[in-house]
Amino acid sequence: MDGVTVINHPLVQHKLTFMRRKETSTAGFRRLLREISTLLCYEVTRDLELTVETIETPMVEMEAPVLEGKKLVFASILRAGNGLLEGMLDLVPSARVSHVGVYRDHETLQAVEYYFKAPESLSERLVIVVDPMLATGNSSIAAVDKLKERGAVNLRFVCLLAAPEGIKNFREAHPDVHVYTAAIDSHLNEHGYIVPGLGDAGDRMYGTK
């Protein structure tokens, strides 16, 4: 599918299966989400630019590659996006962080924005937007809209699960933003939830209803 990468790594798929199971505990779900996020981060950042600095090993001085972390921003769509954010920051602790507060109105299924905070100079940074679910796509579209309004031009979107409807809507709204996902599920139900899915990621992560 154009503009979409499905990450089929065996460890990702194995852990995703355990996250889908309805009997998985809140603690287990949260742990698995953090573990998967590190694997997704590995894939989505494989082409990040490196710079060189001079270091001393126990043997000699050498020129060695290091990541330009200050050029990277992780943008979490609250609240469930924080589950992906934590694992990614484990790998790139020097990255900047943005939070976009958007929730889906359960009656209209439209996105409602309530919070936004981002680093300066977004136009100079790669912005990786994270949210476990790409369902209708409305919340993700709204979040990327806001980031672009603040100057972001180089963005990627990372999720655990995506519905075909959400991918279609998101790609139509933001054809310049590549989507990375662990799986593309069958469809959305009448309530806008991904089927077979894994339920509400935020509720399962935080033990709420």
From Swiss-Prot:
Transmembrane segments: none
Metabolic or biological pathway, per its Swiss-Prot or TrEMBL entry: Pyrimidine metabolism; UMP biosynthesis via salvage pathway; UMP from uracil: step 1/1
Keyword Electron transport attached: no
SUPFAM superfamilies on file: PRTase-like (SSF53271)
EC category name: transferase
Residues that, per the record, bind 5-phospho-alpha-D-ribose 1-diphosphate: R79, R104, D131, P132, M133, L134, A135, T136, G137, N138, S139, D200
Statement: the UniProt record of this protein carries the keyword GTP-binding: yes
Reactions it catalyzes: UMP + diphosphate = 5-phospho-alpha-D-ribose 1-diphosphate + uracil
Coiled-coil stretches noted in the UniProt entry, renumbered to this chain: none
Keywords associated with the record: Allosteric enzyme, Glycosyltransferase, GTP-binding, Magnesium, Nucleotide-binding, Transferase
GO biological process, one term: UMP salvage
Binding annotation for uracil: I194, G199, D200, A201
Regulation: Allosterically activated by GTP.
Gene Ontology MF, one: GTP binding
Co-factor binding comment: Binds 1 Mg(2+) ion per subunit. The magnesium is bound as Mg-PRPP.
Pfam families: UPRTase
Required cofactor names: Mg(2+)
EC number(s) given by UniProt: 2.4.2.9
Purpose: Catalyzes the conversion of uracil and 5-phospho-alpha-D-ribose 1-diphosphate (PRPP) to UMP and diphosphate.
HAMAP family: Upp_B (MF_01218_B)
Family statement drawn from the similarity comment of this UniProt entry: Belongs to the UPRTase family.
Name by which UniProt lists this protein: Uracil phosphoribosyltransferase
Organism encoding this protein: Allorhizobium ampelinum (strain ATCC BAA-846 / DSM 112012 / S4)
